[in-house]
UniProtKB/Swiss-Prot annotation:
Family the UniProt entry places it in: Belongs to the HupF/HypC family.
Cross-referenced SUPFAM superfamilies: HupF/HypC-like
Free-text disruption phenotype from the record: Strains missing this gene do not produce hydrogenase; addition of Ni(2+) to cell cultures does not compensate this loss of function. Interestingly higher than usual urease activity was produced in this strain; this effect was increased by increasing amount of Ni(2+) in cell cultures.
Pathway it works in: Protein modification; [NiFe] hydrogenase maturation
Function of the molecule: Involved in the maturation of [NiFe] hydrogenases. Involved in the biosynthesis of the Fe(CN)(2)CO cofactor.
Protein name: Hydrogenase maturation factor HypC
GO process terms (BP): protein maturation
Lineage: superkingdom: Bacteria
GO molecular function: carbon dioxide binding; iron ion binding
Source species of the chain: Helicobacter hepaticus (strain ATCC 51449 / 3B1)
InterPro entries assigned: Hydgase_assmbl_chp_CS, Hydrogenase_HupF/HypC
């Protein structure tokens, strides 16, 4: 199973690279696998350093909301596990 994370394009660089914001973290990503142009402000799906496709903002925000719920749930489970082992 592969996960692609919604990310917002914040800068277009030379050599077919972009800087994207992924959950508040900026990183460089390759545009080599994308068959369409991207602009600053576009939402894309990022997988292992490659932009896979463009997506609309509504889909991106919904996916990010679900990721945040998953992360929160995982953190709560970890906290419960730590408390149980004290």
């Amino acid at each position: 199973m592969c996960l692609a994370i919604p990310s917002k394009v914040v800068e277009i660089k030379d050599n077919n690279m972009a800087v994207v914001d992924t959950l508040g973290v900026s990183r460089e990503a390759s545009l080599d696998l994308l068959n369409e142009s991207v602009n600053i402000g576009d939402w894309v799906l990022l997988h292992i350093g490659y932009v896979m496709s463009k997506i609309d903002e509504e889909s991106a925000r919904e996916s990010l909301r679900l990721y945040e719920q998953i992360l929160q749930s995982m953190q709560e489970e970890e906290n419960e596990r730590i408390e149980a082992n004290k």
